[in-house]
From Swiss-Prot:
Pfam families: Ribosomal_L21p. One of its GO terms (cellular component) is ribonucleoprotein complex. This is Large ribosomal subunit protein bL21. One of its GO terms (biological process) is translation. It comes from Pseudoalteromonas translucida (strain TAC 125). Keywords: Ribonucleoprotein, Ribosomal protein, RNA-binding, rRNA-binding. It comes from the Bacteria. GO terms for molecular function: rRNA binding; structural constituent of ribosome. Part of the 50S ribosomal subunit. Contacts protein L20. Belongs to the bacterial ribosomal protein bL21 family.
Amino acid sequence: MYAVFQSGGKQHRVTEGQTIRLEKLDVETGAAVEFDSVLLVADGEKIEIGVPFVNGGKITAEVVSHGRGEKIKVVKFRRRKHSRKQMGHRQWFTEVKITGISA
């Protein structure tokens, strides 16, 4: 059984027991989280597609940790002007473990 849900402006395909990284959620470590914006639920041959969300669809997860991703370097370079600027960015994330999928 797998499901597709929406969180942080992105869509994620998950199965029960899977650990994934989402955009940062304001929830403490060890807390339970529920996602109601389920787009698709598939169980073997039975596939339920939402318009836009599945009625009664719910994904429960447990927050494992919070952290920051790897650094991305951004370079702004102006040719022939002897000018350059280098910046870095590390995006915050929340790691969750999927504990249940229901439709």
